[in-house]
């Protein structure tokens, strides 16, 4: 859902800044409390870069998307390596 919001905002350059903050910052901050249990779902060491709304150009959206995708990949790899059982409720989607 976050990726779809960001892609939609790319087609509206005059609203990129607000969309970037709401689509990346909001979801990352809401998962911050789970960062320890999930092994890096948001918050933690990734929270600053993916949650910052300092990017206001379309290039910033692309960087934000890459970070968001990396977070999902790292959460998936962590679930595989850790057995996945205890990580099912952390909300890293």
UniProtKB/Swiss-Prot annotation:
GO biological process, one term: sorocarp development
Record Pfam families: Coiled (PF05710)
Family: Belongs to the hssA/B family.
Name of this chain's protein: Protein hssB
Gene name of this polypeptide: hssB
């Amino acid at each position: 859902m976050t990726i779809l919001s960001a892609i939609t905002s790319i087609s509206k350059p005059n609203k990129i800044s607000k969309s970037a903050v709401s689509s990346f910052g909001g979801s990352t901050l809401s998962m911050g409390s789970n960062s320890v249990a999930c092994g890096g779902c948001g918050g933690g060491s990734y929270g600053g870069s993916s949650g910052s709304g300092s990017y206001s150009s379309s290039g910033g959206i692309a960087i934000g998307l890459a970070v968001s995708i990396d977070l999902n990949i790292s959460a998936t790899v962590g679930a595989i390596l850790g057995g996945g059982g205890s990580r099912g409720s952390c909300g890293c989607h």
